[in-house]
Amino acid sequence: MRGLVQRVIRAEVKSRAADSSEWSVAGAIGPGLCVFVGATHDDTVAQADKLASKIWGLRILDDSEGVMNRSLSDVHETGGPATVLIVSQFTLYGDTRKGRRPSWIDAARPEHAEPLVDRVVDQLRSLGATVTTGVFR
């Protein structure tokens, strides 16, 4: 599994129904982490658990002196909101080595990837994070 992590002041993801031209906010957060999560064919539940644990423990949030020294876990322990926006993203497994058209052959099929992304979300919630998600498509 791959996770692309970004610290954010605010983030939102929009989606639209197949039969509509209207976009709506599927998930939004204030300060926290926005994480794009992708899965490949042979990823397992154990890897999803490891990714969630890694996200929870990354010391990339500012402490009181403005130094990146705190994790979501630290924020949660001090009573702050440990907020995360998880966005499923098959393009993390895009291959652009040949030509100009990416290959998605390394990205897992939705029926394999969706439960793994859901597992990352569930694990983060069980650790104490407030998790918002996009729409899996």
Show where each model-derived region lies:
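N-terminal, polar/charged subdomain of small-to-medium soluble alpha/beta proteins
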Residues: 1-99, 115-137
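Conserved acidic
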Residues: 112
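A charged helix-plus-loop insertion that forms the helical arch/lid used to bind
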Residues: 98-109
